[in-house]
């Protein structure tokens, strides 16, 4: 019986369509999971009366890779509107960036506040 199984297995590997017990004729396909884009989060800077504008520009350049011109525009939006979006990221990245900004601001003894908000 053992020898027959080996022959049958070899036969099945060479020509799987000729084996009677095989379920190859069955039209079953594994369902593919529907993938969705991860939810995005805005990283928001809030204005205060004590943090220098140059420090805000430095933070935007350092943590958000903005060039000087764009960092200055975002800083002015924070200053005039009270808040501005620094970037749009997945949740983990947004939380990390906000934490880094808040930690750097505290180490530099500035009350700058950065938070995340769900987009949309």
UniProtKB/Swiss-Prot annotation:
Gene3D superfamilies in UniProt: 3.30.1390.10
Coiled coil: none
Pfam families: ClpS (PF02617)
Biological processes per GO annotation: protein catabolic process; proteolysis
Protein function: Involved in the modulation of the specificity of the ClpAP-mediated ATP-dependent protein degradation.
Annotated NCBIfam families: PRK00033.1-2, PRK00033.1-5
Subunit: Binds to the N-terminal domain of the chaperone ClpA.
Family under the similarity heading: Belongs to the ClpS family.
Protein name: ATP-dependent Clp protease adapter protein ClpS
Native source species: Pseudomonas fluorescens (strain ATCC BAA-477 / NRRL B-23932 / Pf-5)
């Amino acid at each position: 019986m053992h020898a027959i199984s080996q022959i049958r297995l070899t036969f099945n590997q060479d020509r799987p369509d000729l084996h009677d017990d095989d379920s190859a004729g069955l039209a079953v396909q594994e369902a593919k999971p529907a993938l969705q884009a991860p939810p995005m989060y805005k990283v928001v800077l809030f204005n205060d009366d004590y943090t220098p504008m140059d420090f805000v520009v430095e933070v935007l350049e350092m943590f958000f890779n903005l060039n000087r011109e764009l960092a200055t525009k975002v800083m002015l939006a924070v200053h005039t509107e009270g808040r501005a979006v620094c970037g749009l990221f997945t949740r983990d990245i947004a939380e990390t960036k906000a934490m880094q900004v808040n930690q750097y601001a505290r180490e530099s003894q500035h009350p700058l506040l950065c938070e995340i908000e769900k987009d949309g």
